[in-house]
């Protein structure tokens, strides 16, 4: 979750030769406001005002250091929390699965805060590349999910979870992985934006197509959920960033910390709530998730090669196809398939796994790019 994990701003020369900024916000934002906690409120207020004294500046510097540390070791932190939730679920039982939608909505607002009009430039300057990538996104992963449910003969409660992961848009953490892989960052950002915009229409339709025989799928209800939890917060964040950019520039510096904390919370909530069942079928779920993710990488890259795209574009499409907004998959499973508690598990496991595999693949791609030179 997807990306579905941290925000990174990277400046560099993209394939069109211009200096651009890649902004990335995978995952969700943790807020315990509903539980009366004041941490989030405190820091939101501080971030909306530039520090005007040495004490506040020092606090911000400390927060930035924590943010950098959490971003760097995000995969390790998520794995550790997943293990804790699995083997000692009572320690994180205070994090409820009912928080998932709120967390995802807040992170999408954060994603909107990082978006600028030029992030959509690639959609108009290179529409062919974006179309190829998005078609691959919404054909490869849903079809792979469907095939895996058949091959492994998954029960309906797990099958719908796997299919939801496949039908969701690309995860936003794919942007930073593309940057690390020396891929086409502009294309990655454009694909993420377009696939997210298309999600309210295609995710319910594809879920109905591939899972409709197993479970009841209410497409209209899913459409409204995605609009409410994803599209509206992104638009609001985009508008706020446009009119209050001086304030949001300071806020985005620590969004990775909030985002990563949220992913950890979502994983902890889902895993702890289903720890007993995971212990009995965990290896099966993990095998399906790994195959889904790795085959997505491979087929995404192959599609780019077959269509004679250059290596930077192939790397971007590979990572974009393989990494999903698994946070959205978890949210939809919890909201629309509550009668199947295990449906949330594939999304949670995918959130852990794809951040690990994405980093490994990005490193391999980067080495390959270096050897080519």
Question: Model-flagged regions — what are they?
Answer:
Residues 5-6:
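N-terminal chloroplast transit peptides
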Residues 13, 37, 46-47, 51-373:
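Alpha-helical transmembrane segments of multi-pass small-molecule/ion transporters
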């Amino acid at each position: 979750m997807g990306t579905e994990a941290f925000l990174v701003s990277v400046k560099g020369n993209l394939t069109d030769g211009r200096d651009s900024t890649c902004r990335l916000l995978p995952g969700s934002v943790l807020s315990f406001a509903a539980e009366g906690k004041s941490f989030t409120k405190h820091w939101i207020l501080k971030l909306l005002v530039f520090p005007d004294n040495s004490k506040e500046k020092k606090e911000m510097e400390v927060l930035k250091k924590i943010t950098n540390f959490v971003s760097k070791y995000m995969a390790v932190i998520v794995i550790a929390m997943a293990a804790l939730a699995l083997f000692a679920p009572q320690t994180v039982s205070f994090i409820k699965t009912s928080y998932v939608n709120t967390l995802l909505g807040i992170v999408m607002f954060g994603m909107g805060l990082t978006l600028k009009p030029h992030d959509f430039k690639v959609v108009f300057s290179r529409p062919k590349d974006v179309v190829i990538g998005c078609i691959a996104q919404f054909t490869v992963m849903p079809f792979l999910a469907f095939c895996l449910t058949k091959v492994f003969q998954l029960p309906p409660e797990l099958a719908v979870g796997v299919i939801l992961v496949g039908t969701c848009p690309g995860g936003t953490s794919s942007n930073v992985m593309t940057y690390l892989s020396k891929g086409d960052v502009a294309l990655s950002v454009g694909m993420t934006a377009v696939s997210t915009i298309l999600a309210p229409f295609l995710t319910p339709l594809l879920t109905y197509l591939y899972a409709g025989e197993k479970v009841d799928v209410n497409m209209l209800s899913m459409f409204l959920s995605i609009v409410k939890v994803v599209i509206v917060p992104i638009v609001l964040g985009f508008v706020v960033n446009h009119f209050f950019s001086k304030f949001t520039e300071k806020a985005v510096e620590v969004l990775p910390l909030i985002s990563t904390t949220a992913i950890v919370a979502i994983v902890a909530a889902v895993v702890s709530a289903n720890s007993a069942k995971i212990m009995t079928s965990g290896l099966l779920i993990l095998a399906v998730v790994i195959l889904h993710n790795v085959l997505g990488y491979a087929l995404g890259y192959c599609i780019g090669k077959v269509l004679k795209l250059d290596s930077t574009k192939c790397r971007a499409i590979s990572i974009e196809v393989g990494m999903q907004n698994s946070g959205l998959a978890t949210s939809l499973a919890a909201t629309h398939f509550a009668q199947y508690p295990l449906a949330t598990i594939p999304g949670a496991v995918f959130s852990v796994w794809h951040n690990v595999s994405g980093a490994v693949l990005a490193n391999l791609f980067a080495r390959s790019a270096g050897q080519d030179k």
